Each structure stands twice: as structure tokens, then as C-alpha cells.
Amino acid sequence: MRIIGIDPGLARVGYGIIEIKNDKKILLDCGVIETGKEKKEEDRLYEIFKDLNELISHWKPNLAAVEKFFFYRSSTTISVVQARGVIMMVLASKKINISEYSPAQIKLTIAGSGKASKKEVLDAVMYNLELNKPPKPDDSADALAIALTKLNEEGFN
């Protein structure tokens, strides 16, 4: 089984891909899809669409986990919602089962507290995936935490 965890954004979409093999969690890939701020918004959304399609075609995940978005009063809210829409569309077009989790759910599942710090979540990701060094950048570590949340729900603790 393969899962992709996604941390949505317009400037950076974090992703992490984990495979379960012989009851062991194996990190296959993680990183970010970055879109240049100098580009028009529609070009940035298309870049997310194109790059995510390529990732999914390459890794062929069975499941997807995406962080839920909560509305804040911010100038970036609409852009992030649009990027999230593109992400959901790509996953749906590939017939991948999508689960969504709030930041508090992710923290509670991964680190044991819905109010866990970024460092506590990162430490839990490193422990769960038996990593010697933290995944970089932070958006990819967040995406791995999201994927691990889904795996936990599926019974792979």
C-alpha cells in the first residue's frame, strides 16, 4: 500500500509518499511543489496540477491524506482554497481515496496532543519513519505527518 500526504498551499505544496511493506513504513519520497511568486495565479495553479499529476503517475499511491483548511482572515485564504481545489481534483481524477484531517487531529494522532509543537510533530515523524535527519523543508515533514495520520487510521501504528 502507498499513501501520499499533502500539505496544501499556493506557494508551496508539501508532499510525502510512504509505502507499507511487510508491516514496515518506508519513506519513498518527500518534498515540495514550489510555484514562483512572480507568476500569475492561474499559472501557479496549473503548475500544481501538472507536478502533482506527475508525482501520482510515478508513485501510484492507493490512498491520499490532505490537511483540512480552516478559514482565517488573511489575504492568502482564497489562493490556498483554490490550490486545495486543484489538489482534490487531481486526486479524484486518479480515483484515489481521499481523507482529510484538521491540524489538531494530525498533532493528536502523531504526537499525542492536539496542541503539539512543530518540533514534537517532527520528532514523531522521524521516529515513525526511522529517519536519522528531519525531512526538509518543513512542508514535506508536515505532509508526512498527514500521511502517517491516515496510516494510523488504517491500523498501521
Curated annotation (Swiss-Prot):
Q: Where in the cell does this protein reside? A: Cytoplasm
- GO cellular component term of the entry, any: cytoplasm
Cofactors per UniProt?
Mg(2+)
Q: Which domain of life is it from?
A: Bacteria
- GO biological process terms held by the UniProt record: DNA recombination; DNA repair
UniProt-annotated binding residues for Mg(2+) 2: 67
Mind listing the UniProt keywords for this protein, alphabetically? Cytoplasm, DNA damage, DNA recombination, DNA repair, DNA-binding, Endonuclease, Hydrolase, Magnesium, Metal-binding, Nuclease
Catalytic residues at: 7, 67, 139
Give the binding site residues for Mg(2+) 1: 7, 139
Name the Enzyme Commission number(s) assigned to this protein: 3.1.21.10
Matches recorded under InterPro entries: RNaseH-like_sf, RNaseH_sf, X-over_junc_endoDNase_Mg_BS, X-over_junc_endoDNase_RuvC
> What is the catalytic activity of this protein?
Endonucleolytic cleavage at a junction such as a reciprocal single-stranded crossover between two homologous DNA duplexes (Holliday junction)
Q: Name one Pfam family in it.
A: RuvC
The entry's free-text remark on the cofactor is: Binds 2 Mg(2+) ion per subunit.
The record ties this protein, via PROSITE patterns, to: RUVC
MF-aspect GO terms: crossover junction DNA endonuclease activity; DNA binding; magnesium ion binding
Q: What does this protein do?
A: The RuvA-RuvB-RuvC complex processes Holliday junction (HJ) DNA during genetic recombination and DNA repair. Endonuclease that resolves HJ intermediates. Cleaves cruciform DNA by making single-stranded nicks across the HJ at symmetrical positions within the homologous arms, yielding a 5'-phosphate and a 3'-hydroxyl group; requires a central core of homology in the junction. The consensus cleavage sequence is 5'-(A/T)TT(C/G)-3'. Cleavage occurs on the 3'-side of the TT dinucleotide at the point of strand exchange.
Q: Which family does it belong to?
A: Belongs to the RuvC family.
Q: How does it assemble?
A: Homodimer which binds Holliday junction (HJ) DNA. The HJ becomes 2-fold symmetrical on binding to RuvC with unstacked arms; it has a different conformation from HJ DNA in complex with RuvA. In the full resolvosome a probable DNA-RuvA(4)-RuvB(12)-RuvC(2) complex forms which resolves the HJ.
Q: What is this protein called?
A: Crossover junction endodeoxyribonuclease RuvC
Q: What gene name does this entry carry?
A: ruvC
